[in-house]
Amino acid sequence: MIKKIISFAVIVSSFFIFNTYLHAATGPANIYKITITKVELCETGSTLSNCLNPVDITVGDGVADVDIAAVTAGESAGVVADFGKGIPGKTYTYVQTILSRSVNAKGSVGSCYTANDAASGTANGYATGTQTSGSEAEVTLLVPDFVDPTNYSMIEGSSDAAGTSLRVAGTVGASDTHFRARKILTTPYTAKAGINPTVFLAFGTSGAIMNKAGTCGSAQTLAAAPPDQTVTIQGQ
């Protein structure tokens, strides 16, 4: 699937980045719905593992079931964050986002297709697929649980949508319902009073379904993999 460019007046999101996790094979998603519950900006001095002086820029309660696989160039997937909430004069270098572990997706990896067989994403993040292409269906997949603080210090699991109870960096647990992820901005953003920049996001879902080792159709092998994503800010 081609990369899609999305233009937002006051929106930004970050997404999980462990696309090499478990070295699993990946395939395209035709449907890929995510839920974003909180977005924060991180001041200069922040790192992948630490958001310095975070400022909450979430609009309302965030957005649910945004299908990033269906959004075409120039369309908005919903307003989730307002850069106007940044503190004037402060410069921000990272964005930090809380997302649901659950992803509604439809797609395949090779000859293994997502299947609505009531065996959707289990607590460890994997679901049973099908080898019959005609049975492909939208299903709930989960971001897999993992422990890898060396390579994924930008991610930590959360037991709630607000991020009030977080695991240590590089860990997502089976009982977590959400996770928090940090991503560096392509260009630092300096907040100015009365000015909201235009934020461009580029999503690609050609590798958004993940398939680990096992027999498709009898073993739980499918999980959500991250879409390609970049954030660019204009009009500062």
What are these regions, as identified by a protein language model?
Residues A9-I17:
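Bacterial N-terminal signal peptides
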Residues A24-Q236:
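A short, solvent-exposed, low-complexity linear motif enriched for acidic/polar residues
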Residues M1-I2, I17, A223, P227:
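Generic N-terminal leader/processing signal
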Residues M1-A9:
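Bacterial N-terminal signal peptides that target proteins for export
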Residues I17-A24:
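Sec/Tat signal peptide C-region and signal peptidase I cleavage site
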